[in-house]
Amino acid sequence: MEHLISLFVRSIFVDNMIFAFFLGMCSYLAVSKNVKTAVGLGIAVTFVLVVTLPVNYFLQTKVLAANAIIEGVDLSFLSFILFIAVIAGIVQLVEMVVERFSPSLYASLGIFLPLIAVNCAIMGASLFMQQRINVGESDPKYIGDVWDAISYALGSGIGWLLAIVGLAAIREKMAYSDVPDALKGLGITFITVGLMAMAFMCFSGLNI
């Protein structure tokens, strides 16, 4: 249980997908103009992470790993293709659910909802998980079973959600601020993201 909590907290604050690895920046910048829309996308990304990582963990350990199916056969070269296929399938399911039950959110997210399928934060989480399976049990980042994968996925999703909602809240306030003309738009947004990332750097020294 302690290891699960450690993985969860680390993935939110220490190994935040946005502020530590800058993954998923395209949709992060494009959909962070409104808090409501940002919350919707953040929840969708979190859901996709929580569903895809356990599936990809199973594929990695039971199918792709060396000697997993047949002695002497290593299918790890197929990991990119299979991971992307799983992510795309789950995203398609999420898109259909959102369109059915929340048409306004579906319209607000626009093209960025199906683009979750190529959101590098989700693919990055699967690849980080793939690496962490092999680091050894003594490493705090170790992912040794499906529950570790779920904990890491949930933390990564919540970390991404916090990042996009935080930026959206700031950008809503900045819309009424006297921003210099040269910095309006993405200029002041990049500065804001940089300051937020620097703030999250204070967590990097935590020994969790």
Model regions and ranges:
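Interfacial loop-to-transmembrane junctions
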Residues: 172-190
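C-terminal ends of transmembrane helices
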Residues: 23-37, 91-105, 167-178
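Hydrophobic core segments of alpha-helical transmembrane domains in multi-pass membrane transport
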Residues: 23-27, 45-51, 84-93, 118-125, ...
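Generic transmembrane alpha-helix signature in multi-pass membrane proteins
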Residues: 22-30, 95-101, 112-113, 120-139
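Juxtamembrane transmembrane-helix termini in multi-pass membrane transport proteins
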Residues: 6-47
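Ordered, amphipathic secondary-structure segments that act as subunit-interaction surfaces
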Residues: 61-109
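Cytoplasmic-side transmembrane-helix entry/capping segments in multi-pass membrane proteins
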Residues: 37-47, 78-83, 105-116, 182-188
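Structural signature of hydrophobic alpha-helical transmembrane segments
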Residues: 6-19, 73-87, 150-163
